[in-house]
Amino acid sequence: MRVDDDRFPWDQDSILSRDLLSASSLQLCYENLNRSCVRSPYSPGPRLILYAVFGFGAVLAVCGNLMVMTSILHFRQLHSPANFLVASLACADFLVGLTVMPFSMVRSVEGCWYFGDTYCKLHTCFDVSFCYCSLFHLCFISVDRYIAVSDPLIYPTRFTASVSGKCITFSWLLSIIYGFPLIYTGASEAGLEDLVSALTCVGGCQIPMNQKFVLINFLLFLVPTLVMMTVYSKIFLIARQQAQNIEKMRKQTARASESYKDRVCKRERKAAKTLGIAVAAFLLSWLPYFIDSIIDAFLGFITPTYVYEILIWIVYYNSSMNPLIYAFFYPWFRKATKLIVTGKILRENSSTINLFPE
């Protein structure tokens, strides 16, 4: 989605002459082909470390999110509208780990694209679509948590399975409708024809974005982000007020046990806190990348390659974060994972196992 170069001159002849000069001293992606891209490989030590780091992220994204999806879809106790949203979010992150991260790993470490022009475009479409799909899911989840915390007793009648299904459908359709035509129609490259021609070489996969679509991308990121920040600030205020009210009631009545409403409020606040951490992790991962994209689009792609690689892999690693967050905060997820890993979910009636502590 950007130019993979440290300093980009906008003159095509200077690019070609520089590439020819580099080709005489550096390796090529395809040694026996004309117009092969220049390859600058890492030495064996750093190369091995990078493969280990990037590969671990891809495996964690695939396996961790697969655990989340399996847990929610298999165990009946987890069949709720809110959890279906979480499972759909895990599906988007799972697809990032499966269709994007392994191929980006090879490109980042080897400096070449070995998977063909067709999958180069598909890879970029997957990248854009699935990542925006995650963002839209998180936005809807934040709204769901706001409803649950603000009035937990009527929440089940407001956020139903039908509403959850509409949120999931909207998230997937909008991200796919935006991502795929954007890349396949070449709309993102309009006005950059000379740049695209200069960058075209065998073993490359650079799809630059013009200023118009960089701004559209940023707006698609900014609007849900503002919604989430507004909603979670309200959730924080409501949760704090509820906690103060419950504490006052306990002091006044000296009750040893909690009321049903107190328990529901406490549970919903914990869920909101956990998913709030997931949202914060997403925003911290994505914001530096979007800021860099805007800077590059308007200042001529000045970001050094290694800085861009760091930013994009922070984004990719976000797809691996949510299962770790769930594992840390949710005992039911740890128990479900143990049942899946040990194969106990294959037993008869395993879907009815109680995952929640008494």
Swiss-Prot record:
InterPro entries: GPCR_Rhodpsn (IPR000276), GPCR_Rhodpsn_7TM (IPR017452), TAAR (IPR050569), TAAR_fam (IPR009132). Olfactory receptor specific for N,N-dimethylalkylamines trace amines, such as N,N-dimethylcyclohexylamine. Trace amine compounds are enriched in animal body fluids and act on trace amine-associated receptors (TAARs) to elicit both intraspecific and interspecific innate behaviors. Ligand-binding causes a conformation change that triggers signaling via G(s)-class of G alpha proteins (GNAL or GNAS). The chain crosses the membrane at residues 48-68, 84-104, 123-143, 167-187, 213-233, 275-295, 310-333. Gene3D superfamilies: Rhodopsin 7-helix transmembrane proteins (1.20.1070.10). The keyword Nuclease does not apply. One of its GO terms (cellular component) is plasma membrane. It is found in: Cell membrane. Residues 1-47, 105-122, 188-212, 296-309 are extracellular. One of its GO terms (molecular function) is trace-amine receptor activity. GO terms for biological process: G protein-coupled receptor signaling pathway. It is a multi-pass membrane protein. In addition to the well known disulfide bond common to G-protein coupled receptor 1 family, trace amine-associated receptors (TAARs) contain an unique disulfide bond (Cys-37-Cys-201) connecting the N-terminus to the extracellular Loop 2 (ECL2), which is required for agonist-induced receptor activation. Belongs to the G-protein coupled receptor 1 family. It comes from the Eukaryota. Keywords: Cell membrane, Disulfide bond, G-protein coupled receptor, Glycoprotein, Membrane, Receptor, Transducer, Transmembrane, Transmembrane helix. Residues 69-83, 144-166, 234-274, 334-358 are cytoplasmic. Pfam families: 7tm_1. It comes from Rattus norvegicus. This is Trace amine-associated receptor 7d. Disulfide bonds join 37-201, 120-205.
